Amino acid sequence: ELLAKLQIDSKKVELVPVEHQLAHASSCYHLNESDEKTAILCLDSKGEYSNIFLGYGENGKIVRIKEFYNPDSLCGMYAALTDYLGFEILDGEFKVMGIAPFGDPDKYDLSELAKFNGKKFKVNNKLIGTVGLRRYKAKSKGHYFSKKLVEMLGPRRVGNLTDDPYVHYAAAIQKLYEDLTIELVEHFLGDVLDASGRLAISGTGSMNIRLNRMLKAHPRVKNLIVHPACGDPGTAIGAAAYVVRKEGKKLQPMKNVFLGPEYTTEQCIEACKLSRERPVWEVLEDPKERAVELLANGEIIAWFQGRMEFGPRSLGNRSILASPDEAEVSEKL
């Protein structure tokens, strides 16, 4: 049905399966391919097999160096603390990341949650990533951590995230996530980075911009490539790119992801007039100046311009903006 809408003859279509992490890897490598060898890191909650992929791309081919499998997941570790801090998994991670700078990462030691000893990366499943009867339960809901974690850290957050100890737990899990990722990259991808300095990353874990900043600042990384649609929707592009490249065809670099619809001022005004909510509208002479004024006064604004971006990131055309001055800004958003 979809193929018919796209005017593609289904009889001429061949279905080619591509592994989840390979699709992630392809999305960040094949669409930014270089003549130099490129280190590849994919951090994911879970795929059909692995959830951490470390490898490299060279001459259009992707080579695996190391993969880790559930329940040993960096994203799973972060998700468990997101759950403990009172947020929904796969939704609240950015709030934890956003509040982390307001805490002291060294006030509480969370290193018992996961360790890398130079060979093995292991998550402590007695504390997090638990399943079945070992899960901590409250109000008939099972959580992604155990009763032992609650005994170690105290009750799951129900109050203000900026309160002690929760704001410091947010800072500590962010630091642990960064430190373990850097250790894995240095151990498994160090030689590739020494050769070219190129690192391409994808997967839901690469939505963590604080981690990305750490990777970009790493002395061995000269060029950091982050696929804009680094979550699962981006694997559609990655899988297609993987198959095309496997056939020997080189792809054009992806210059941007502003691929969606755009609307004129007149269309926006007409939409306001037709809305039952009857929103008040005003045409501004200098929208940027007004936006700065509102942000400085602690307001939250929606920024809307040009074509809609593909993927989960606000890249400037469809963005919710707020000043990061206040510790409560994540809660407000």
Summary of predicted features, one role per range:
Residues 15-18, 159, 163-179:
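Short acidic-aromatic active-site loops that bind/stabilize oxyanions
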Residues 81, 181, 204:
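Conserved hydrophobic/aromatic pocket- or pore-lining residues that grip, position, or stack substrates
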Residues 171-196:
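Phosphate/ATP-binding catalytic cores across multiple sugar-kinase/actin-like superfamilies
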